[in-house]
Amino acid sequence: MIAFLTSTLGDFYLMDEMVVDLISKNDFTSNLRQIWKRGSKGLFISADPADFSGNDRMRDEFFRAFRVAGLAFERRDICDGRMKGELDLSDVDVIILGGGHVPTQHKFFKKIALKEHLSAFDGILLALSAGSMNSGETVYSIPELEGEA
């Protein structure tokens, strides 16, 4: 697995709706191009498994940003609370771990046994914000909500 752990995957703009442009700073996009598989199959793993509409918007916007940057996906799946059965990464080339509330995402990652599934994953892992933090072995997340301390 090749992992990119970032604070963000792009520059965010708010017009009528959120728009993301992939960052090119520090050769991020060019490094991705060097390892990108044509016809990649992507999976967006959400931070909040219950926020279906927000998850759909984030998935769609991130995958649009990749397409605009010349990094197209053949398939664009999502993993959130609508997922039925076990997580299956056998036909996935690129995983995007979304950003959001770190403890909520951490619980979801535990529920779907993401760490165990990633041990055999041989593709590209792109993590942003909370997704990057939850990729660490030991993480200190400043409490945001009552009862998190």
Q: What do these predicted ranges mean?
A:
Residues R33, F63, A113-S119:
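Short amphipathic alpha-helical segments and helix-helix/interface helices
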Residues V68-R76, V102-L114:
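Short, surface-exposed, charge-dense and proline/glycine-enriched linear segments
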Residues T104-F108, L114-A149:
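Class I SAM-dependent methyltransferase SAM-binding "motif I" and its flanking Rossmann-like core
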Residues M18-V20, R57-D60, F109-I112, Y140-P143:
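Short, glycine/charged-enriched secondary-structure capping and boundary segments
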Residues D11-F12, D51, V102-P103, S132-N134:
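Glycine-rich nucleotide phosphate-binding loop and flanking beta-alpha elements
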